[in-house]
A protein has these predicted regions:
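Transmembrane alpha-helical segments in integral membrane proteins
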Residues: 2-19, 84-99, 179-194, 252-259, ...
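Hydrophobic alpha-helical transmembrane segments
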Residues: 2-5, 108, 205-210, 244-245, ...
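Membrane-interface loop-to-helix entry segments
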Residues: 3-7, 11-43, 239
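Hydrophobic alpha-helical transmembrane segments of multi-pass membrane proteins
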Residues: 6-13, 73-84, 172-183, 217, ...
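Membrane-embedded translocation segments of transport machinery
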Residues: 24, 28-186, 196-210, 214-215
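Hydrophobic alpha-helical segments and their helix-loop junctions in multi-pass secondary transporters
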Residues: 35-59, 127-131, 218, 222-223, ...
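Alpha-helical transmembrane segments
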Residues: 188-202, 226-233, 252-277, 333-334
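A generic transmembrane alpha-helix motif of multi-pass inner-membrane proteins
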Residues: 232-246, 276-335
Length: 335
């Protein structure tokens, strides 16, 4: 609980300031530090016995799962979360850019650096898994777990077997996780912060106080006895079904209602590389079509595997979000 309080106080202290003096300054420090820490971990992991086994596992494709809907849902959720797609974060940050910004260039830099960092980090993760597999005699496939299981179960076990090196590498690894979590939380909070300020005329400090207070109360549910189960359900819904559905909806709105063809000139302005008809086709037809297929088969698979409780919780979350959104909109009308 103390850790939760400290984290939310840090988030509040940073978010109550203006973008450049708050998130901007913190990101300039935490993001480079995150890269330096992960670089140290990756370089060290490549010196461990068995690292080649882990890298071989990472780079060896398993074509048998190519048509597994859960693989595609996991891939979508990973890239959506890491690039903060469909959550108004990019839109919020873009509103601060000057008129002559090279949008396409910026997008390419963000996507390339994000994907490059993830691949770079994966070499370190699988090298450490290879080391554990060799030293413990357990097949590496049995060590690979998702999300919190990998971070808070597998890696602590690995670090405990490393002796002095693990005592150095372990704190660095979890410090990197902390930095990544704080910067992600700040990013998720910023669109809500701007919306509250614009809709209700609150100061940034007051808006940050309200949102961080609500966030803290909600976070308390994830510290109870069933926290891991709640995290699994909420994370699976938000990253795999909720956000995926919103992105498909955004494609329809921007592609068919608002007229994405009119945005090409704005997007291409001042950029070295340009988008054209192919980009429009992807937004209007290909992306929503693929998402709809994956989303539908994902729901069917969830029902077939008996995930009725998970689906029920997901429905409750969805209805809660919709009701809260409608209530806030109505409240704005009567303010």
């Amino acid at each position: 609980m103390a850790g939760l309080v400290i984290v939310w106080v840090m988030i509040w202290f940073i978010s109550k300031k203006e973008l450049n003096s708050g998130i901007g300054k913190v990101s300039k420090v935490l993001i480079p530090l995150l890269f330096v820490i992960m670089a140290a971990i990756v370089i060290f992991s490549l010196t461990l016995p068995g690292h080649n086994l882990g890298i071989e596992t990472l780079l060896t494709p398993d074509w048998s799962v190519l048509f597994d809907v859960n693989i595609w849902l996991a891939a979508f959720s990973q890239i959506i979360f890491s690039l903060s797609l469909g959550m108004a974060i990019a839109l919020t940050y873009a509103s601060y850019l000057p008129e002559d910004s090279k949008l396409i260039n910026n997008v390419l830099i963000v996507v390339s650096s994000n994907s490059g960092f993830e691949i770079f980090t994966a070499f370190g993760v699988f090298s450490i898994l290879g080391f554990m597999s060799v030293t413990s005699g357990v097949p590496i496939e049995s060590l690979i777990r998702q999300g919190t299981g990998l971070v808070f179960i597998v890696f602590p076990t690995i670090f405990n077997t490393m002796g002095i090196a693990g005592k150095i590498l372990g704190p660095l690894f979890f410090l990197a996780i902390l930095f990544a979590g704080i910067t992600s939380a700040l990013g998720f909070l910023e669109p809500l912060l701007n919306s509250v300020c614009d809709k209700f005329g609150f100061t940034r400090k007051k808006s940050a106080s309200i949102l961080c207070g609500v966030g803290f109360v909600i976070s308390m549910f994830f510290t109870c006895g069933i926290s891991s189960y709640l995290v699994e359900i909420v994370d699976g819904f938000l990253n795999q079904f909720g956000i995926l559905f919103l992105i498909a909806l955004q494609c329809i709105i921007f592609g068919w209602i608002l007229g994405i063809d009119d945005l090409i000139e704005v997007v291409n302005k001042d950029s070295v590389m340009h988008v054209g008809k192919l980009w429009v086709t992807i937004i209007k037809y290909i992306l929503p079509g693929v998402i709809f297929i994956v989303w539908t088969f994902g729901i069917i698979d969830l029902i077939k595997t008996g995930g009725f409780l998970e689906l029920a919780v997901d429905v409750v979350i969805t209805l809660s979000i919709l009701i809260a959104s409608v209530m806030l909109t109505k409240f704005e009308d009567y303010k």
